[in-house]
Curated annotation (Swiss-Prot):
The chain crosses the membrane at residues 41-61, 82-102, 130-150, 163-183, 194-214, 235-255, 276-296, 309-329, 366-386, 395-415, 426-446, 450-470. Belongs to the HAK/KUP transporter (TC 2.A.72) family. Its main location: membrane. This is Probable potassium transport system protein Kup. Transport of potassium into the cell. Likely operates as a K(+):H(+) symporter. GO terms for cellular component: plasma membrane. Keywords: Cell inner membrane, Cell membrane, Ion transport, Membrane, Potassium, Potassium transport, Symport, Transmembrane, Transmembrane helix, Transport. It is a multi-pass membrane protein. GO terms for molecular function: potassium ion transmembrane transporter activity; symporter activity.
Length: 651
């Protein structure tokens, strides 16, 4: 591949040549799909997957040049070195690592850090807590990225006003806040109607990127020499200290690369790869090389090269298009945050959250009010606190590089445990990725005092919350299990001293079907009655994203009064107990909602010095438990058929 990229072709031709080779490798095991359907999916991928990385040219090259400048002076070798670094970073990290390897590590078609964690946990039985910890760190870093992306993207687009109309400079931050507040405010309405234009707008954006870059490449065609890795290597070795800092800024060109994997389940591998190889990658290269050529011929333009190289007649349209593109990029990140939050709830990493479906046709379109509120507040606070996209740039890289580092570690386990690769085959590849990831991560971590503290702070708080929830639920389960009575013993006692039998069916939800549910025990204690039919219901989340309806329910008859039912959902599926119980008819149980009551136990938690957790963590867990959404709503049980029985537990 490097041979093709070092030839005499233009960057677009080189990327297309590389695309031919890479696409063949990426799709060697897939059949052809219908062309029209493929075009639609590719267009959709442009609007959802590539918004973040597609808007990076607005600020990435500018920040890299600022880092590379010595006393504010840029040499020709510096400019060529920076653009060469960007080219090879995009090639090695996005095209090689993600396109050729990471996108193959799907969990039944789904991607994302939590999908990868679930996949690895299923394959690596020995150390589930270690993998869970890695997955939690990855998810926390993703949310940190989700906070910073809308802030830096929209703010960088609005800074174009400084070029179009300098007198509007004081309004950049207020206008950014207005746009972001509006964006988060309309989330509850759903994006189904407007999402249809996301793809075409982003396609226009990439055309504008490529066209403006190609036009200015002719300012200094010798800029294409930077395709040669010699310029990147020379830049890294001549002044290592300056180069190290610059590498952290160069990484801004790759922010959003993780979206290729995160959105795998929405579009599939082939549309995502084709969109990258044939549209996004070439257009990004043209723009970056165009900015470099423009600066080589207009040395004074390093302040805002992206907008300064746009002709005056096209400045306003470009600012408007950039704003639209960054809003779309922000929307994609917000939607991704909802998806990851839902996965985290299903995998019991976060407490239950209220999840609203905004589309009757598309089940994946959801809105989570609490996530939206917290995300929106954090984004606005960042904009008001940092005020300039250049100030936010330092905070941006840490979250994304950390996430990529976690992905690489988990990818090694996938290679050796699931793909059954020999260590001698997998290790050199992973070590290569780790060297690159560690270089970018270390170059960004030194920016903690410049703003990186924001990213680390967000991730740390989220890790603390998620780990407290995981640890607390385990302690609670162990505590209640010690106090619970085995179901066998209760059934045996009822056989000797039968309670009063009343007509109807009682469904008792429990996490442990071997123990008598707390609600059943309190019902017998206070009401002294037993229903004619009793169902001990357990809801299980599988380590795969989707579970077919045929595999949803397992039913076993315990005795003439009791039945054990297990419902299994994928971590991407919203539990609907009513609908799932309807599937039990084919298994011999004729479920009738009109004669059925659901008994749920509502626990009142109190902190205890004997919980095994620090007191502050006990209190945090109790707070999280109190803020969890109602089980009746979460499991979609008709409220008129629910009986809640309260219990007090000292954890």
């Amino acid at each position: 591949m490097s041979g093709e990229l070092n030839g005499n072709d233009t960057s677009a031709q080189a990327a297309v040549s590389a695309g031919s080779v890479l696409e063949g490798a990426a799709f060697a095991d897939e059949g052809e799909q219908h062309n029209e359907s493929m075009k639609t999916l590719v267009l959709g991928a442009l609007g959802v997957v590539y918004g973040d990385i597609g808007t990076s040219p607005i600020y990435a090259f500018r920040e890299a040049l600022h880092a590379a400048a010595t006393n504010g002076i840029l040499a020709r070798s510096d400019i060529l070195g920076v653009v060469s670094l960007i080219f090879w970073a995009l090639t090695l990290v996005v095209t090689v690592k993600y396109v050729l390897f990471v996108l193959r590590a799907d969990n039944n078609g789904e991607g994302g850090i939590l999908s990868l964690m679930a996949l690895v946990r299923g394959a690596l039985k020995g150390r589930p807590d270690l993998i869970l910890g890695v997955g939690i760190c990855g998810a926390a870093l993703f949310f940190g990225d989700a906070v910073i992306t809308p802030a830096i993207s929209v703010l960088s687009a609005m800074e174009g006003l400084e070029i179009v109309a300098p007198n509007l400079t004081p309004f950049v931050v207020p206008a950014t806040v207005v746009i972001l507040v509006t964006l988060f405010s309309v989330q509850k309405l759903g994006t189904g109607r407007v999402a249809i234009v996301f793809g075409p707008i982003m396609a226009l954006w990439f055309v504008a990127l490529g066209a403006s870059g190609l036009w200015h490449i002719f300012d200094d065609p010798t800029v294409m020499a930077a395709l040669n890795p010699y310029y990147a290597v020379r830049f890294l070795t001549v002044s290592p200290a300056v180069a190290f800092v610059t590498v952290g800024a160069v990484f801004l060109a790759m922010t959003g690369a993780e979206a290729l994997y995160a959105d795998l389940g929405h579009f599939g591998r082939k549309p995502i790869v084709r969109a990258w190889l044939w549209i996004v990658f070439p257009c990004l290269l043209l723009n970056y090389f165009g900015q470099a050529a423009f600066i080589l011929s207009h040395g004074e333009a390093a302040a805002l090269p992206f907008f300064q190289m746009i002709p005056s007649f096209a400045l306003w349209p470009m600012v408007l298009l950039a704003t639209a593109a960054t809003v779309i990029a922000s929307q994609a990140v917000i939607t991704g945050a909802y998806s990851v939050a839902r996965q985290a709830v299903q995998l019991n990493i976060l407490p239950r959250l209220e999840i609203q479906h905004t589309s009757e046709k598309l089940h994946g379109q959801i809105y989570i009010p609490r996530v939206n509120l917290l995300l929106g507040l954090a984004v606005v606070i960042l904009v008001l606190g940092f005020e300039k996209s250049s100030n936010l740039a330092a905070a941006y890289g840490i979250a994304v590089t950390g996430n990529m580092l976690v992905t690489t570690v988990l990818l090694y386990i996938v290679m050796t445990r699931i793909w059954n690769w020999r260590v001698s085959r997998a290790l050199p590849i992973i070590l290569g990725f780790l060297v690159i990831d560690m270089l970018f991560f270390s170059a960004n971590i030194i920016k903690v005092h410049e703003g990186g503290w924001a990213s680390i702070g967000i991730a740390t708080v989220l890790v603390l919350i998620m780990w407290t929830w995981v640890r607390g639920t385990r302690h609670l389960f162990q505590k209640t299990r010690k106090a619970e009575v085995p179901l066998d013993l209760i059934v045996e006692q009822m056989a000797k001293r039968p309670p009063t039998i009343v007509p109807g069916t009682a469904v008792f939800l429990t996490g442990d079907p071997k123990s008598a549910p707390t609600a059943l025990m309190h019902s017998l204690k206070h009401y002294k009655v037993l229903h004619e039919n009793n169902v001990i219901l357990t809801v299980v989340t599988a380590s795969k994203p989707w579970v077919a309806s045929a595999d949803r329910a397992r039913v076993s008859q315990y005795n003439e009064r009791f039945m054990l039912v297990t419902l299994t959902f994928g971590y991407m599926q919203q539990p609907n107990i009513l609908r799932a119980l309807g599937l039990c008819r084919r298994l011999g149980w004729k479920f009738d909602i009109m004669t059925t009551s659901f008994f749920l136990s509502r626990r009142s938690l109190k902190a205890s010095v004997h919980s095994g957790m620090p007191l502050w963590q006990d209190k945090l867990f109790i707070l999280l438990a109190r803020t969890a959404s109602d089980a009746t709503e979460y499991f979609q049980i008709p409220t008129g058929r629910v009986v809640e029985i309260g219990t007090q537990v000292n954890i």
